[in-house]
């Protein structure tokens, strides 16, 4: 689990394009940022950093977050 991401959970955001992309990829119609935050905070979420991004894996979903800006880049269902 990555403490830096969890300590900055309130800084997590996304762009308008990110919202559309994530809603489409995950087939959801809810607040994307809150949905992702809830997944990240789940005790079963596997959080790891690779390069400049955090990856959060839970419930067959992968959420990609920029480690500098805490912007959700994308989220998709594992293939």
Regions found by a protein language model. Give the residues of each.
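Ribonuclease/tRNase effector modules and their secretory precursors
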Residues: 1-79
């Amino acid at each position: 689990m990555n403490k830096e991401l969890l300590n900055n959970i309130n800084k997590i955001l996304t762009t308008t394009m990110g919202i559309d992309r994530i809603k489409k990829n995950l087939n959801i119609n809810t607040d994307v940022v809150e949905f992702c935050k809830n997944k990240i905070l789940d005790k079963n979420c596997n959080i790891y950093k690779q390069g400049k991004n955090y990856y959060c894996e839970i419930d067959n979903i992968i959420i990609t977050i920029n480690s500098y800006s805490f912007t959700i880049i994308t989220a998709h269902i594992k293939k």
